[in-house]
Amino acid sequence: MPSLWDRFSSSSSSSSLSRTPTPNQPPRSAWGSAAREEGLGRCGSLESSDCESLDSSNSGFGPEEDSAYLDGVSLPDFELLSDPEDEHLCASLMQLLQESLAQARLGSRRPARLLMPGQLVSQVGKELLRLAYSEPCGLRGALLDVCVEQGKSCHSVGQLALDPSLVPTFQLTLVLRLDSRLWPKIQGLFSSANSPFVPGFSQSLTLSTGFRVIKKKLYSSEQLLIEEC
């Protein structure tokens, strides 16, 4: 099965996507480098701060007020930090993430289709791009672990390597959440290991719009960065 990076590379064969520095080639595009230099001073402060909660159930605003608030956020300026190369790769990553969640196995009896609301897809993508911005290889250097949290339990869904040919420079752990109101519907998924396996999907479950991302640099001894959204 071709890797995510192979699929991404074949769809963008008209441009060189390598970020490995060479004497005659900068590590990123001139446009991306200029944007990075312009926003780097502000990016440093992001490594120690939590992002604002995007879950309207945890905020004092409704969906319209939340949208208006997000439109006014200027730190970081997402347009300044954007990189077309990473944005294209992120879109492919989000598609692969949704496919993995659709085949997730949360218990021993049946797998469940976990569905990401559109708002969650958008916000997770933006957060991954922001956390990858200060990395030497951008999003290509990410190793993404995906977990689903329900109550005090955290269930691993899988690990996604964006470019298997590249040594990862940082690790991201994405912790998604099931809506607590769904708990009566999913208790059967967490049966004991002795219960017989029943093939097929039990049901489709929609994830909460709240999530958490934990970033760990693999080339540095810096403390973990935890982003709560």
Swiss-Prot record:
One BP annotation, GO: protein-containing complex disassembly
GO molecular function: 14-3-3 protein binding
Compositional bias annotation for Low complexity: 9-18
The keyword Mitochondrion belongs to this UniProt entry's keyword annotation: yes
UniProt keyword terms in alphabetical order: Antiviral defense, Apoptosis, Cytoplasm, Mitochondrion, Phosphoprotein, Ubl conjugation
PANTHER family given in the database record: DNA DAMAGE-INDUCIBLE TRANSCRIPT 4 PROTEIN (PTHR12478:SF7), DNA-DAMAGE-INDUCIBLE TRANSCRIPT 4 PROTEIN DDIT4 (PTHR12478)
Stated name of the protein: DNA damage-inducible transcript 4 protein
Protein source organism: Bos taurus
Lineage, opening ranks: Eukaryota, Metazoa, Chordata, Craniata, Vertebrata
